[in-house]
UniProtKB/Swiss-Prot annotation:
It holds the Pfam family KIND. This is Protein spire homolog 1. The keyword Transcription regulation does not apply. SMART domains: KIND. The gene is SPIRE1. Residues 556-576 are annotated as: Spir-box. Its main location: cytoplasm. The modification Phosphoserine is found at S387, S406, S464, S465, S467, S678, S682, S735. Residues 229-257 form a coiled coil. Keywords: Acetylation, Actin-binding, Cell membrane, Coiled coil, Cytoplasm, Cytoplasmic vesicle, Cytoskeleton, Host-virus interaction, Immunity, Innate immunity, Membrane, Phosphoprotein, Protein transport, Repeat, Transport.
Length: 756
């Protein structure tokens, strides 16, 4: 369909191709009356609503139809009387035109345009239009009923219906004489309608402002079309819903007779629809009259009822009434939300004052490693308690044997067999059956005399790093010579040959109250006061790991941070030697080539790993895992990393070698050379305390940096071993054996007080 520009004021009339009348029943023309329809006939509107149009719609249809007829008369188109309401077409944009009459009663024939007229006078067309509008206002009423119209509308229809009788001489109907007498017609009141212009003037005079007539009446016709289409959609949905309900009911109750649903007729639905629209336009107005000047006619039809309601809500043009309950406002509306909350708080039982509250003691929080280190640094060094006998013995150890008070009273009455027995017990590391028998006989001979024993220094206190292997070899050989002695004393002698340093803090030594200390088999019994706590040497692993860090280090110890800096400087120097190879140098400098293997290139899909030590990109094959201290502990010496920082694979491979040696018979230890013994000791090499390595993180380092770190650690630990050896030798020279023979030739002897 081709649409014209405007409705009444003058524009080209639109032409239409009539495809049939609209929906006579809401369900019959559901597809035809969809969103694609642009025009509805007045007869379709009346049939759909099943009630007459209101007065404002009648004013609008009359004004818009006369406007289109006036525009057609200027183009000298033939006139035609309006025979039925089906010829009046209301368009979507608010225009109203006349269609030619249908030959048949059912549907109109196809016509070239909207305005196809035969020769007829203008007054006849106005008269027929007035009659059709009156029938639309009287639609649905009985013959004996008549609708009461407002005086202006009744006068307009009366003038339009009596136009032919009032002016029978004007047969041509041209507007030449009308245009010449235009000023006089504007001054005097229109007593008779002779042209379309007179009808339009009467319609415009109905409004408060005549200049708003075109826009207002166009808006009314546009609203009429929109509301009619919405009603049709509403009725179509209701009918489809009823059909679906019937189908569901038939499926559920197939055996029973189908009962018809109680339906509301279309007329009832249309009546309800009209009532809702009327209430929205007239009755429900959520706005104050005092806020703006109320202009009922031009504004009411500019928007649909829904748009009007939403506009009033957005602009807050409403006043809410106070809801009264039993003649009074409800309590919850009297107070604000803040006051209600305060009243609720006041209604609760009073709270206890803060001073009267007794909170539970906070649970003890486990101290972190950092706090424990700081506490040990701030605390004074605690010395372990020693018995008076040990103090006396340490004093005797500071002078030669000849100056000792115990050996000055040398009145030896002990047989030679006792001395040999003590020597053999010292070599084998345990008491034999002869010692037990001899001790029993001695106690029987002298029951009243109490046995006071002096303890000679053990081999573990005198041997150095070089003499330890020889002593072990000697003890194992002696154990193999005398098969009657058990093999356990040799293990105990080896495990107890190291003494903890005498200046260890008491927190690092185990408490002797927890378990009974084992009696040393190579020492002679002595009595100690019961109120003096005995010192229990720690286990081999803990004593060795702590002993390493207690002796003063007299060599240069590089820290982790310094080694990292040295490695980064070496890497930069290594990069400079590739300057003559521009491609390799550029790729290495930009991080597009692995710095270790220099064969793997990195692309968008192949990412590189960054070595945390030298800060250079490496590939996955050259990247290894290594545990390193974090930033606060980067000042630790590099030798403190030890084997624990190396990769798990290497440490496990290294541990497999000595693990087999531990399961071999003890007698085969004597067959090892010094090289195999050093390999066994490397597995038991001293490590950094595990409690200080809890927060070390596993970092990614390249194979070159890992090798570099391992070499520095091994060299630093060799220097540390030499320093520890010198420290041990310096301490052990302060012994009362000033001119003792070599460790391989020395055999200690112990004598009791009674023997002296």
């Amino acid at each position: 369909m081709a649409q014209a520009a405007g409705p009444a004021g003058g524009g080209e009339p639109r032409t239409e191709a009539v495809g049939g009348e609209g929906p006579r029943e809401p369900g019959a023309a559901g597809g035809a009356a969809g969103g694609s329809r642009d025009a509805l006939s007045l007869e379709e509107i009346l049939r759909l609503y099943n009630q007459p149009i209101n007065e404002e719609q009648a004013w609008a249809v009359c004004y818009q139809c006369c406007g289109s007829l006036r525009a057609a008369a200027r183009r000298r188109q033939p006139r035609h009387r309006v025979r039925s309401a089906a010829q009046i077409r209301v368009w979507r944009d608010g225009a109203v035109t006349l269609a030619p009459a249908a030959d048949d009663a059912g549907e109109p024939p196809p016509v070239a345009g909207k305005l196809g007229y035969s020769q007829c006078m203008e007054t006849e067309v106005i008269e027929s239009l007035g009659i059709i509008i009156y029938k639309a206002l009287d639609y649905g009423l009985k013959e004996n009923e008549e609708r009461e119209l407002s005086p202006p509308l009744e006068q307009l229809i009366d003038h339009m219906a009596n136009t032919v009788e009032a002016d029978g001489s004007n047969d041509e109907g041209y507007e030449a004489a009308e245009e010449g007498l235009g000023d006089e017609d504007e001054k005097r009141k229109i007593s008779a309608i002779r042209s379309y212009r007179d009808v339009m003037k009467l319609c415009a005079a109905h409004l408060p402002t005549e200049s708003d007539a075109p826009n207002h009446y166009q808006a009314v016709c546009r609203a009429l079309f929109a509301e009619t289409m919405e009603l049709h959609t509403f009725l179509t949905k209701i009918k489809s819903a009823k059909e679906n309900l019937k189908k569901i009911q038939e499926m559920e109750k197939s055996d029973e007779s189908s009962t018809d649903l109680e339906e509301l007729k279309n007329a009832d639905w249309a009546r309800f629809w009209v009532q809702v629209m009327r209430d929205l336009r007239n009755g429900v107005k959520l706005k104050k009259v005092q806020e703006r000047q109320y202009n009922p006619l031009p504004i009411e039809y500019q928007l649909t009822p829904y748009e009007m309601l939403m506009d009033d809500i957005r602009c807050k043009r409403y006043t809410l009434r106070k809801v009264m309950v039993n003649g009074d406002i409800p309590p919850r509306l009297k107070k604000s939300a803040h006051e209600i909350i305060l009243d609720f708080i006041r209604s609760r039982p009073p709270l206890n004052p803060v001073s009267a509250r007794k909170l539970k003691p906070t649970p003890p929080r486990p101290r972190s490693l950092h706090e424990r280190i700081l506490e040990e640094i701030k605390a004074e060094r605690k010395l372990r308690p020693v018995s008076p006998e040990e103090i006396r013995r340490s004093r005797l150890a500071m002078r030669p044997l000849s100056m000792s008070y115990s050996f000055d009273l040398s009145d030896v009455t002990t047989p030679e067999s006792t001395k040999n027995l003590v020597e053999s017990s010292m070599v084998n590391g345990g008491l034999t059956s002869q010692t037990k028998e001899n001790g029993l006989s001695t106690s029987q001979q002298v029951p009243a005399q109490r046995k006071k024993l002096l303890r000679a220094p053990t081999l573990a206190e005198l041997d150095s790093s070089e003499s330890e292997e020889e002593t072990l070899h000697k003890s194992t050989s002696s154990s193999s010579v005398s098969p009657s002695f058990p093999e356990e004393p040799v293990l105990e002698a080896v495990s107890t040959r190291k003494k903890p340093p005498k200046f260890l803090p008491i927190s690092s030594t185990p408490q002797p109250e927890r378990r009974q200390p084992p009696q040393r088999r190579h020492s002679i019994e002595k009595e100690t006061p019961t109120n003096v706590r005995q010192f229990l040497p720690p286990s081999r692993q803990s004593s060795r790991s702590l002993e390493e860090f207690c002796y003063p280090v007299e060599c240069l110890a590089l820290t982790v941070e310094e080694v990292m800096h040295i490695r980064q400087v070496l890497v930069k120097a290594e990069l400079e030697k590739y300057q003559q190879y521009k491609d390799i140098y550029t790729a290495l400098k930009k991080g597009k080539l692995c710095f270790c293997c220099r064969t793997r290139r990195f692309s968008f899909f192949t990412w590189s790993y960054t070595c945390q030590f030298c800060k250079r990109p490496v590939c996955s094959q050259c990247c290894k895992k290594m545990r390193l201290p974090s930033k606060p502990y980067s000042t630790l010496p590099i030798f403190s990393l030890g084997p624990s920082a190396l990769q798990r694979g290497e440490s496990s491979m290294r541990s497999e070698k000595p693990s087999t040696a531990h399961h071999r018979p003890l007698r085969s230890i004597a067959r090892f050379s010094s090289k195999s013994k050093s390999m066994d000791k490397s597995d038991e090499e001293l490590q950094f305390p595990k409690e200080l390595m809890e927060d070390w993180s596993t970092m990614e380092v390249c194979v070159d940096c890992k090798k570099f770190i391992s070499e520095i650690i091994s060299s630093s630990r060799r220097s540390l071993v030499l320093a520890n050896k010198r420290a041990r030798l310096k301490r052990k020279t302060q012994s009362f054996y000033m001119s003792s023979p070599g460790p391989s030739e020395y055999c200690p002897s112990e004598r009791t007080i009674s023997e002296i």
